[in-house]
Amino acid sequence: MTNIRKSHPLAKIINHSFIDLPAPSNISAWWNFGSLLGVCLALQIITGLFLAMHYTADTTTAFSSVTHICRDVNYGWLIRYAHANGASMFFIFLYFHIGRGIYYGSYTFMETWNIGVILLFAVMATAFMGYVLPWGQMSFWGATVITNLLSAIPYIGTSLVEWIWGGFSVDKATLTRFFAFHFILPFIITAMVAIHLLFLHETGSNNPSGLTSDSDKIPFHPYYTIKDILGLLFMLLALMMLILFSPDLLGDPDNYTPANPLNTPPHIKPEWYFLFAYAILRSIPNKLGGVLALVFSILILMLFPSLHMSKQRSMSFRPLSQCLLWILVANLIILTWIGGQPVEYPFISIGQMASISYFCIILILMPATSLMENKMLKW
């Protein structure tokens, strides 16, 4: 008799995806982030569902309803902070996951990579709309500033912004629709994750050497299930320490002031995970130019397969490319720092230099270095 795991139509899908899946024998802890992102997504959907049971998407009561969740709902404070800090963990893992993909050349799986970039855009949109929901000062002004960027689009810009707002300013209609979109998007993301995995399982996982591993595969379970559970324990430890010891560490104090359209906060800034893109946006004095730079700073990820000039897939044996990648990481940290600073000297010029460096490293220096490494190896 055949094992039900291998014969039942539903169990068969799970078996081929998580149990009998052939996996390379040498994948490192950098391959843990995919499963951790899956756990984060599940955590966000579950905590978000419980928050939605008590939240009201109305300008007069939204702020009070969040306060009510934290004060009066059983473990409401825990659910709220798990959701807010869970989003931060989500982005930390996303950036690690993308960084690993760049380092080890995983972007050569074109379909998987491009769906991943679309997923990144969807997660960023979801996080932005979620930040608006508590209806604090930074929620309101963040929504106003970021949606206003669309007015830079020639001819249709102003009409488009008013259409998104549902009026002539960010108001009740905007909050209601943002809540609706914030609720539905994670389910769309879940469906896209399934497609992401579908394409990944067509090719199989990459590995640190960048070489094909068909001759040396091991079953996913128990080897990588145990490894993923260990990663999960570390994640939960970090997340619980963040929630229980300093839940507001990554938030903005201005968001504890109810939204007031008549009073602008001294410095409008998004959550920490958008600061690098915000710095790139602000570094260009022209509005349309800034918006294009902002979009292209993420969209540039889709160019990685075309910009790959090396004869080797992974950076494991390419020290010059490795140095350049770590310079890019340092550059992104500088951009994140600049995004949180006021628009004044010397931050403006530092931001402009870091923005130029960002695009130069990816578009010029990395391909040039790859070609140079090929020459050094006489390929």
Swiss-Prot record:
Q: Which Pfam families match?
A: Cytochrom_B_C, Cytochrome_B
UniProt binding sites for a ubiquinone:
H201
| GO molecular function (one) | ubiquinol-cytochrome-c reductase activity
What cofactors are annotated for this protein? heme b
So what family is this one in? Belongs to the cytochrome b family.
Sum up the protein's function in the record's words: Component of the ubiquinol-cytochrome c reductase complex (complex III or cytochrome b-c1 complex) that is part of the mitochondrial respiratory chain. The b-c1 complex mediates electron transfer from ubiquinol to cytochrome c. Contributes to the generation of a proton gradient across the mitochondrial membrane that is then used for ATP synthesis.
Q: What is the protein name stated in its UniProt record? A: Cytochrome b
